[in-house]
Amino acid sequence: MKTVFCSFGLLMAAVPVFAQNTGKDSIVSTKALDDVVVSASNISRVGDHLVIYPNSQQRKHAVNGFGVLENLNIPGLIIDAKSNQVDVMGLQATLYLNGQECDIREIQMLRPRDIEKIEYYDAPSGKYAKDKLVVNFITKQYRYGGYVQADGLQTIGYDHGDYNVATNYVKGNNSYTVFAGANYSHVDGTETWNNENYQFPQSLFDRESYSKNSYRNHQKYMQFRYQNQKGKRYWVGKFTLVNLSTPRNASSGFAKESTETDIFSNIRKKSLSPKIDLNANLPLSKNQTLTLGVHGKYSANSYHRLYQEQPFEAMTDEDENALSFQLSAIYNYFSQKHSLSVELFHYHDVWNADYSGNCELWQHLWKGESLAFFSYNFQASRRLSLKTRIGLDWLQYHLHGDNSFSQLSPRINTNVQYQLNKGMLLWSFNFVNSNHGMDVINRAMIQVNSHMMEKGMPELKKSHDINTYLYYMGRFNRLSVSAIGQFRYNHHPLTDDYYLDEANGKIVKTYSNGGNAQYYSAILALQYKLCKFANLSGDIRYNHAEVKTTWSKHNNNLTGNLGLNMFMGDFALKPYLHFGKKSLDEAALVISKTPIDYGMSCSYSRGNLYVELQVVSPFKKQEKQYWLDLPICSYSKSIKDQTASQYASIKVAYSLDFGRKTQKVEKDVNKNINSSLLRVE
């Protein structure tokens, strides 16, 4: 009777969700033992992190590690599958698998049943000290056998598919894995309306335009991995090959000033990128470890853009070779009350780029960044712990034909954590230097349209950032609470800049990094277990952003999320609602307005089969708006994106074991392409 009443109440309330789930158990009573909090549930706190053992519901109603993470009892957790970012209370989390850094797409081949536990670090230390928040998936270890696993996703409403296959064989301490996959997007019908104003000394140009987009994108990848592991000692070697191609990104329509003119643009891109990774974790003694990493990557990139607006025409061809490597060494020592670590990193990039068409230019650019840190953690009492991480960052780069840039900057990170009876309070302070992208540091100049050009900016000022926040997490029987207040100050932030080029009669869009930027935010997140098979989650978020550089901009935003998770035998139902928001892009100085986003997923899971159907904003096509308002130029843009609403997707996954059971190895494929090219997208 209680279950029937709860079900009726949930259906009447019809409250939607976002990406979180309360597990079957909650903390009813806790008992502190030194820095370990032993709980009467599947969640406990050990020092600077939570240890979470996913329960049967959280495993059953997930297709992979991504789904398990969505189902965990972490208030304020939001996962953006398109951008591959995990946000917890406004802070970006870094994902690890068995102590190795990865991203969301890298764990899509990890079966929920093979996850032993998940470590959630809200005060990272040791090898994780460089991260704000950490989610580390720990998988079960097996000795013999293998598996074959396949999954596929297909959308309805626009044409998109994502298909993957993996096979793994384990014998003793050795594991051999092959991943392969492909995805594509064929999208037609995205519409853009744009009202632009260009202020020239003798005249003001008002311009209206409309365009419809046709987009084609294809991606293929493969990876071979070998791993040898014995206890806490392991080393892993990986070879990855990624091929990206955008054969068509065409927009056609009209532009109207004094007369109406047809406009057409098309962008073609392709990249081929092999990558080698070597990682090792070496226990030196019972309380000492050494972690080593060597990574190398090469990318061959090409970019072609054609823009026509009679009688004006602009064409840009860009070819680039990019080479990068990374070295890391982390030493850790830990005891009952103290721990320390020494970290050394070096990142090196070299780019060679040829521009042709309207811009004839050859560029050679190299960048090196070396970092050294010393961290010390002290358990002052059963409840109070202190962490200090200090270091130096030496950043250098040189663009051919320009002066070299060199900056030696301090890095400081201090955390104070206090354990409460039913929660935790954390204060964090960070002082870091900013590191700008190499697509900014160049002298290329390309045509955007008949009134505007875009160019890079190699002369940048030294800059630094200060970030501090106060974070609270508490659990009270059925209720989980998280709250955070954050302040960020950027000295010499990088922003878009505009000026008039009288010689060419064009407005030039470039970059500058003077002035400062400030950001304030506050978030309150709640989760409540309604009954045995359902839980409710939600949050409210406020932020204020202000930029004072060549131009001054500010924005206030209040938004929130609601969610409901229901588990009924082999089925799960997860409706969600994201309220609309207004955001300031602090770099582009553009304000955007996103409407309410809602949807629902329904899944079936039994044995090795998982099927999920998702519907996104089915009743109305979303229209996102953008504003840029500067004295020299401004625009008001409205976009109806075919991939943002009125579509559904179906996902099917199946795995087959052979021999004895083995763990499902995480898919560790980074599909990002290294590039320094200046582009108009």
Predicted regions and their residues:
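Flexible loop and strand-edge segments within Gram-negative outer membrane beta-barrel domains
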Residues: 185-324, 350-351, 363-365, 444-448, ...
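Exposed, low-structure sequence patches enriched in small/polar residues
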Residues: 62, 73, 101-110, 114-120, ...
